[in-house]
């Protein structure tokens, strides 16, 4: 099972139990966070697609750690003027572990639902 969800302007592809880094969230370590802007959920039988979001779709995750990302170096340089300016930036990140992806079929209200077994059968048999 996997899902695609959105935080701000970024989209993340996650599976249950996966650990990912997202932009800093102002919650304490050990708390749970719930993401409601779910774009797509795929379970064993169906794919649910939102327009743009799935109504009752949610992803629950544990906050593991707050840290800084990799350093990005910025250089400003003017030729023949002996001018150089160096700057660095480290983005604040939050490490989360996906605990649960809501796949309760009766609760999900989505734009489109595709039955995977039927779709694959149609492609194989040429219907």
Swiss-Prot record:
Domain of life from the UniProt record: Bacteria
Q: Which GO terms describe its biological process?
A: translation
Which keywords describe this protein according to UniProt? Ribonucleoprotein, Ribosomal protein, RNA-binding, rRNA-binding
GO CC, one annotated term: cytoplasm
For this protein, the record's SUPFAM superfamilies field holds:
L21p-like
User: InterPro entries from the xrefs?
Assistant: bL21-like, bL21-like_sf, Ribosomal_bL21, Ribosomal_bL21_CS
GO molecular function terms noted in the UniProt entry: rRNA binding; structural constituent of ribosome
Name the family.
Belongs to the bacterial ribosomal protein bL21 family.
Q: What does this protein do?
A: This protein binds to 23S rRNA in the presence of protein L20.
What quaternary arrangement does the UniProt entry report? Part of the 50S ribosomal subunit. Contacts protein L20.
HAMAP family from the UniProt entry: Ribosomal_bL21
Q: What is this protein called?
A: Large ribosomal subunit protein bL21
